[in-house]
């Protein structure tokens, strides 16, 4: 079923993604893969299912990579974009897209790091019925986690009466949070000045509160913010366990615990434990063990190594055991032999990480000495 009311949407895509470093050194946050597919692909497919074909993004960090991927996409989306010279805030970015929307229309705004299969159609219906200027998708979470999010307090009719920005557990008046899924009327632009850094939570919503014009709809389906490394890892596990469902991936409730894209070379002797994904074009050596890890495209893993609880970005070359590591794109991790004052360090598990900045990081785990 597709809606017939909302025909346009915006995806906020300008963020640098510093909490996902080093993955975002070479890849913008919207292109971070979930089960080997960029999160923005998933969002665009979700919008297409709703009947929304016209989408605009505000870009800033690594903008050309986003534009290159979607300007001539095969997703059935008419992709539009603006390039920001400086960051404008969440609301300021929307303001720069104002000419894309028609006066009087209702539209959707999503965050590029929000992974969800929310019933947005339910949100649209709630928005229209409410007469609000803005409707926010809210999610109930465990009370002990509220300090990481913007908390919303609603009245008996679902209208917001108070916001709390990352309150302490003791001070939180609710355990419902703002998911960054918005449905707006065109009138929202009246509350955002031109050429000003402006934020929804800090600047726009307080003004709408005075007019009692912010409605909510509850998201009972899956939603997560993949803006941190920990949550990025968890979202992949959630796919395996069937907690979130997206049409593009076959790994839901996978008994094998692994998802491998076509075109990767995986020997039969490879051992998988836990849940792992492997991108396309990867070359895995003999007797490799992969445990609870996310491996992007075109990665090389040498023989006789173990990769555990790690993320390896595209085109990296791994020749040493790694555990609890996050490796950015185009990096080399290898075992090396070291000499010191005429002594050879034996049984030394050293890792040399040679990254694009040409720095070398040495990790000494254990070693003994023998004369040269």
Question: Where are the model-predicted features located?
Answer:
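A short, conserved acidic/glycine-rich loop-to-beta-strand motif
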Residues: 130-140
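Short internal beta-strands
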Residues: 56-60, 137-138, 311
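Conserved catalytic-core motifs of eukaryotic protein kinase domains, centered on the activation segment
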Residues: 22-25
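Catalytic-core segments of class I nucleotidyltransferases/pyrophosphorylases
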Residues: 106-108, 115, 121-128, 141-144, ...
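Conserved N-terminal catalytic core of the sugar/cofactor nucleotidyltransferase
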Residues: 1-11, 19, 33-111, 115, ...
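A structural motif detector for beta-strand N-caps
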Residues: 249-253, 258, 263-271, 276, ...
